[in-house]
A protein has these predicted regions:
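Extracytoplasmic/periplasmic terminal helices and flexible tails
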Residues: 1-164
Length: 164
């Protein structure tokens, strides 16, 4: 086993191996606020970033999906395949709630950032406007896992050569 290998159960993703020794490995769970998973809505194929907010162990949040996407409660969420850790199509969960990001930020200052560019002009960017906050109910019961499986990326070395 090696670091950065994906860990799944028969119901969905569990985490990523973060440390190994000769006999043991530890896993960073998807229930870690620093974990970000590339995921997509299976029906519409819209990509986003799946994160845990640190509260409810049954739900994750899918961010960065445009408000124009026709997402529905009950839609399946799967891995997006844009990483070498998890291939595309592994089950994660289902959409349980959809919230407009505009509803989550009532103070416009919380949404606006200023960026300075080369010519010393300043651009205001609204970082969350027009995006959905999607609550995803996990297929896995993360408090009751028995058997897990490890995913080894067979193309990882070849991909890393391209990056050099």
């Amino acid at each position: 086993l090696k670091t950065e290998m994906g860990v799944i159960s028969s119901d969905g993703i569990v985490g990523i191996i973060d440390n190994t020794t000769k006999r043991y490995s530890s896993i960073m769970s998807i229930l870690n606020i620093e974990m970000k998973i590339n995921a997509k809505v299976k029906r519409t194929e819209h990509f986003g970033t799946l994160e845990w907010d640190g509260f409810d162990t049954r739900h994750l949040t899918l961010n960065d999906i445009s408000e124009t996407a026709k997402i529905k409660v009950g839609d399946s969420i799967i891995t997006g395949g844009m990483s070498l850790i998890f291939p595309e199509g592994i089950n994660i969960g289902t959409v349980s709630k959809i919230i407009s990001q505009n509803e989550t930020y009532s103070d416009s200052k919380a949404r606006t950032i200023k960026i300075s560019v080369r010519d010393d002009s300043i651009i205001d960017l609204d970082i969350r406007e027009n995006y959905l906050k999607i609550e995803v109910k996990l297929h896995n019961d993360m408090s009751n896992l028995n058997n897990v499986y490890i995913i080894e990326s067979l193309n990882k070395k070849e991909f890393q050569k391209l990056k050099k």
